[in-house]
UniProtKB/Swiss-Prot annotation:
Bridged cysteine pairs (disulfide): none
Required cofactor names: Zn(2+)
Record has Phosphoprotein as a keyword: no
Parts of the chain that traverse the membrane: none
PROSITE patterns per record: FPG_CAT (PS51068), ZF_FPG_2 (PS51066)
Zinc finger (FPG-type): 247-283
Catalytic function, reaction form: Hydrolysis of DNA containing ring-opened 7-methylguanine residues, releasing 2,6-diamino-4-hydroxy-5-(N-methyl)formamidopyrimidine; 2'-deoxyribonucleotide-(2'-deoxyribose 5'-phosphate)-2'-deoxyribonucleotide-DNA = a 3'-end 2'-deoxyribonucleotide-(2,3-dehydro-2,3-deoxyribose 5'-phosphate)-DNA + a 5'-end 5'-phospho-2'-deoxyribonucleoside-DNA + H(+)
UniProt keyword list: DNA damage, DNA repair, DNA-binding, Glycosidase, Hydrolase, Lyase, Metal-binding, Multifunctional enzyme, Zinc, Zinc-finger
Gene name, Swiss-Prot/TrEMBL: mutM
Annotated GO MF terms: 8-oxo-7,8-dihydroguanine DNA N-glycosylase activity; class I DNA-(apurinic or apyrimidinic site) endonuclease activity; damaged DNA binding; zinc ion binding
Protein name in UniProt: Formamidopyrimidine-DNA glycosylase
Similarity annotation: Belongs to the FPG family.
Length: 283
């Protein structure tokens, strides 16, 4: 599933084609994805101007001129793709099979925005902009890891006394929004913390030290366009390339990259997810 860097990369890719532009025509090609689409969604989107595109955790919100926001979740395989007749500045050829094009937005200026989702685990909804944060998918989320509310004091307080593994704590969207399996593995490796270590056992310094590392990993991944392991593509159909710089994720059996370490990357399963770690570096 796309994590924060992938969703932020998609948002940035959509912005030139959508922000400030009118939705000249919307088409909805099926009744549902993961959940049913809102009633008359195509009719309600047509004629609306996109005021801005923003991201909350792993969700994209397009704020519209009529006072509603289009809430978008990519799910496991969803793609928001920019294409159009005017190839050039930000319009591209459509890189995915059209049979999975479930929602199409024809934008003022000639761009076409397509929500393509082969596995149909994605979702779209229309919500009142002023009440968007109260939407059931958003209301439970913790602070953004790249925002000012997420700092060392906050994280130390949330981890104190917790008897869950530190990896599970960082994946808990109520504690911090947008982190997923890939980036938590990478963060814990850089921090030298074993994924199975209890969150409450971390010293205050260790807890506070996670915050700059989380930001570091996320910003590096955004700069690289995210990680393409299976379905994820940027808005122009291109692959992300942060996967080429993984230090631990997916490297089971390979030597640890830490200079002077003789360890080999191992893999354990936690709550059904693979955790990659160096048993020598991470304690």
């Amino acid at each position: 599933m796309p994590e924060l860097p992938e969703v932020e990369t998609v948002r940035r890719g959509l912005e030139p084609a959508m922000a400030g532009r009118l939705i000249a025509e919307a088409r909805v090609n099926r009744a549902d994805l993961r959940w049913p689409f809102p009633p008359r969604m195509a009719e309600r989107l047509t004629g609306q101007r996109v005021l801005r595109l923003r991201r909350r955790s792993k969700y994209i919100l397009a704020d519209l001129s009529g006072g509603q926001s289009l809430l978008i979740h990519l799910g496991m395989s969803g793609r928001m793709l920019v294409s159009g007749a005017q190839l050039g500045e930000f319009f591209h050829d459509h890189p995915a099979p059209s049979r999975h094009d479930h929602v199409v937005l024809e934008m003022e200026g000639g761009a076409r925005i397509t929500f393509n989702d082969a596995r149909r685990f994605g979702a779209m909804d229309l919500v009142a902009t002023e009440a968007a944060e109260a939407h059931p998918l958003l209301a439970v989320l913790g602070p953004e890891p790249l925002g000012n509310a997420f700092d060392g004091a906050y994280l130390a307080a949330r981890l104190e006394g917790r008897r869950t593994p530190i990896k599970a704590a960082l994946l808990d969207q109520r504690i911090v929004a947008g982190l997923g399996n890939i980036y938590v593995c990478e963060v814990l490796f850089r921090a030298g913390l074993a994924p199975g270590r209890l969150a409450g056992s971390l010293s205050r310094a260790e807890s506070e030290g996670l915050v700059p590392l989380i930001r570091e990993v996320l910003l590096e991944a955004i700069e690289a366009g995210g990680s393409s392991l299976r379905d994820y593509r940027q808005a122009d159909g291109e692959l992300g390339y942060f996967q080429h710089t993984f230090r631990v994720y997916g490297r089971e059996g390979l030597p640890c990259v830490t200079p002077g370490c003789s360890g080999t990357v191992g893999r354990i399963v936690q709550s059904g997810r693979s955790s990659f770690h160096c048993p020598l570096c991470q304690r």
